[in-house]
């Protein structure tokens, strides 16, 4: 993907469907933030009666044949002294949605006068690029004729030296290839995005990037490894499970190794503990954790980061037939720990448990970070805009929080309340797979933590149940799959581990 281009001169810009002009909100007036303002002043001056330039405000007007663009987007950046990275991100995302609805495919973007910016030009460009890329995506609709708005095909950023801008553009484009991969997988039909499909995606990535290797465990290999929890969840499906291990070695001589684990339930019926029909409608997205870790590896491989990262994906359906695993039964995982099934709809933690054990046995991890659409309790707690996370390591938690703030992908650390472990007590097994009807996100995290078995490895669990999928178009995300977490984790890996 090469969408963005840069040009130092505004006067030599190419013709385009539209131009984006930035504006500051002053005390008693509106001021165009770009030096090119005079060329269009007679046109936009009339529109300023209804345009206050408050942060994220957008207005579309026509150029009436004046200049090299057919339309002009007035983009409000608010008060200069209050400008934040997130406001830049959301403002250009909003402008992108407006342009696409107007059927524009090419756009010239005029930067504010650099000396007036309160954030660095690198920060401004990064968030401008991310904002546009986030909404330059189409959900794969299955209608006979496409009803999607056209995508932007060329974005020409004016008033910046290419040497500075192009590096940022290529980096963000590579990251968003990973975001789009995540979205495509989550949005795909469950009958198409099967465990084997995820395995094939991983194989394709290993072929594309020389620094990657892949290992796929089929059903027989899963049983041979005694992954009794993953095997139990898979019993009710006509589709065989897969266990995917995709390794990126960007620094082979280093012993530092990050393992990312993604829940890969490609469709979750709830099993014999059947979900209500309405709750099942979005359950093709229950593999968003798997899609996220594959998207992250795509991004770090494209950026050629000097790190060692392995993505592990336990992939299966949670379906129903006569052989489906049953409530009240006990199954033993790869760790040797036994689990009484209190609910067949608490399957995600079971397959993650075997993945954690595999990582500890074979990967020698420095840290493990898992991603899962794990609990409805997290959605109730934090909604769609914030993902809750748990960690046994304060440094890891702080670094993830910083990455969250820098990328505007909100994470909130929640407590691992050891007292709540008693909710997982079983009289006949080492534990149950579900607690009481309270603190469900915490007890799910405590369940996973048990499978670390006190080994000295840093661990974080990200419950993305609320953030992975959107019911409607939002400021930064299109409807349906969001790709949440890919940008945050790539930032974390690049800043804190690429040394």
Swiss-Prot record:
<comment type="similarity">
    <text>Belongs to the peptidase M17 family.</text>
</comment>
<feature type="binding site">
    <location>
        <position position="345"/>
    </location>
    <ligand>
        <name>Mn(2+) 1</name>
    </ligand>
</feature>
<dbReference type="GO" id="GO:0070006">
    <property type="term" value="F:metalloaminopeptidase activity"/>
</dbReference>
<keyword id="KW-0963">Cytoplasm</keyword>
<feature type="active site">
    <location>
        <position position="349"/>
    </location>
</feature>
<keyword id="KW-0645">Protease</keyword>
<feature type="binding site">
    <location>
        <position position="268"/>
    </location>
    <ligand>
        <name>Mn(2+) 1</name>
    </ligand>
</feature>
<dbReference type="GO" id="GO:0030145">
    <property type="term" value="F:manganese ion binding"/>
</dbReference>
<dbReference type="InterPro" id="IPR023042">
    <property type="entry name" value="Peptidase_M17_leu_NH2_pept"/>
</dbReference>
<dbReference type="GO" id="GO:0005737">
    <property type="term" value="C:cytoplasm"/>
</dbReference>
<dbReference type="InterPro" id="IPR008283">
    <property type="entry name" value="Peptidase_M17_N"/>
</dbReference>
<dbReference type="GO" id="GO:0006508">
    <property type="term" value="P:proteolysis"/>
</dbReference>
<dbReference type="InterPro" id="IPR043472">
    <property type="entry name" value="Macro_dom-like"/>
</dbReference>
<dbReference type="Pfam" id="PF00883">
    <property type="entry name" value="Peptidase_M17"/>
</dbReference>
<feature type="binding site">
    <location>
        <position position="268"/>
    </location>
    <ligand>
        <name>Mn(2+) 2</name>
    </ligand>
</feature>
<keyword id="KW-0031">Aminopeptidase</keyword>
<keyword id="KW-0378">Hydrolase</keyword>
<keyword id="KW-0479">Metal-binding</keyword>
<dbReference type="InterPro" id="IPR000819">
    <property type="entry name" value="Peptidase_M17_C"/>
</dbReference>
<comment type="function">
    <text>Presumably involved in the processing and regular turnover of intracellular proteins. Catalyzes the removal of unsubstituted N-terminal amino acids from various peptides.</text>
</comment>
<feature type="binding site">
    <location>
        <position position="347"/>
    </location>
    <ligand>
        <name>Mn(2+) 1</name>
    </ligand>
</feature>
<protein>
    <recommendedName>
        <fullName>Probable cytosol aminopeptidase</fullName>
        <ecNumber>3.4.11.1</ecNumber>
        <ecNumber>3.4.11.10</ecNumber>
    </recommendedName>
</protein>
<keyword id="KW-0464">Manganese</keyword>
<feature type="binding site">
    <location>
        <position position="347"/>
    </location>
    <ligand>
        <name>Mn(2+) 2</name>
    </ligand>
</feature>
<feature type="binding site">
    <location>
        <position position="286"/>
    </location>
    <ligand>
        <name>Mn(2+) 2</name>
    </ligand>
</feature>
<dbReference type="InterPro" id="IPR011356">
    <property type="entry name" value="Leucine_aapep/pepB"/>
</dbReference>
<feature type="active site">
    <location>
        <position position="275"/>
    </location>
</feature>
<dbReference type="Pfam" id="PF02789">
    <property type="entry name" value="Peptidase_M17_N"/>
</dbReference>
<feature type="binding site">
    <location>
        <position position="263"/>
    </location>
    <ligand>
        <name>Mn(2+) 2</name>
    </ligand>
</feature>
